[in-house]
């Protein structure tokens, strides 16, 4: 773990671990603690009231953030024929079938998102052991296995983030960069929270959104009052 700077230690001392901060105040604290020379990402962790060990309570999906993430995704598409042309026209960085699979097997993967037309899954299915551990395996639940490859590419380029609850019942996502103003960060977080609410499992009982905290790539985490999140 990287050592905290004097500034980060001072700010960490100002953050009350049990206090719920208004979103604007939480972001201000996080930005003050972000001392890296690069434009750090602003990340969020959302504790959900689910038992992730139960298959019917696994929360997974994708949402296009209204203000993007501050990073343009590199997109690969497995498709052929007309679908391949649609993907290229939509801005896909790499498009192919067996040739693209060969590149993946060789370790040549210059992309952040993988999308597949349904008929391409016969090829993509052989790449599970490579793409899966990297979080790149296409899945219909997050819209990356779809006949509408053009829309999927546009969504990925527009700042779509995928989310999946971990074993502890927590969702981790990036909602922007330190350079974003508070309104954009708040709008992005509101969109994510809305998507999570819509993904609530029917079997989830009690309080669903339990805790929300924001942090920068290398900074401290600050808990947020969910009542102050709405855009």
Curated annotation (Swiss-Prot):
InterPro entries: Ribosom_uL1_bac-type (IPR005878), Ribosomal_uL1 (IPR002143), Ribosomal_uL1-like (IPR023674), Ribosomal_uL1/biogenesis (IPR028364), Ribosomal_uL1_3-a/b-sand (IPR016095), Ribosomal_uL1_CS (IPR023673). It comes from the Bacteria. GO terms for cellular component: cytosolic large ribosomal subunit. The keyword Cytoplasm does not apply. GO terms for biological process: regulation of translation; translation. Keywords: Repressor, Ribonucleoprotein, Ribosomal protein, RNA-binding, rRNA-binding, Translation regulation, tRNA-binding. One of its GO terms (molecular function) is tRNA binding. PANTHER family: 54S RIBOSOMAL PROTEIN L1, MITOCHONDRIAL, LARGE RIBOSOMAL SUBUNIT PROTEIN UL1M. Binds directly to 23S rRNA. The L1 stalk is quite mobile in the ribosome, and is involved in E site tRNA release. Belongs to the universal ribosomal protein uL1 family. Part of the 50S ribosomal subunit. This is Large ribosomal subunit protein uL1. The gene is rplA.
């Amino acid at each position: 773990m990287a050592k905290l700077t004097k500034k980060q230690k001072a700010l960490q001392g100002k953050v009350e671990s049990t206090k719920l901060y208004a979103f604007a105040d939480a972001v201000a604290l996080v930005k003050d603690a972000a001392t890296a020379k690069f434009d750090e990402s602003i990340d969020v962790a959302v504790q959900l009231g689910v038992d992730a060990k139960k298959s019917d309570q696994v929360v997974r999906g994708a949402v296009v953030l209204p203000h993007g993430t501050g990073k343009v995704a590199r997109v690969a598409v497995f498709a052929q024929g007309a679908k391949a042309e649609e993907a290229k026209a939509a801005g896909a960085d790499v498009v192919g079938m067996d040739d693209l699979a060969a590149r993946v097997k060789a370790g040549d993967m210059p992309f952040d998102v993988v999308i597949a037309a349904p008929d391409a899954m016969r090829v993509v299915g052989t790449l599970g052991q490579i793409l899966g551990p990297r979080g790149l395996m296409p899945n219909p639940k997050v819209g990356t296995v779809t006949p509408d490859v053009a829309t999927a590419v546009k969504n990925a380029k527009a700042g779509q983030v995928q989310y999946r609850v971990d074993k502890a019942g927590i969702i981790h996502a990036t909602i922007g960069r330190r350079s974003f103003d508070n309104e954009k960060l708040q709008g992005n977080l509101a969109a994510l929270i809305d998507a999570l609410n819509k993904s609530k499992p029917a079997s989830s009982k009690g309080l669903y959104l339990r805790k929300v905290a924001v942090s920068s790539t290398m900074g401290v985490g600050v808990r947020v009052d969910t009542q102050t999140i709405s855009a």
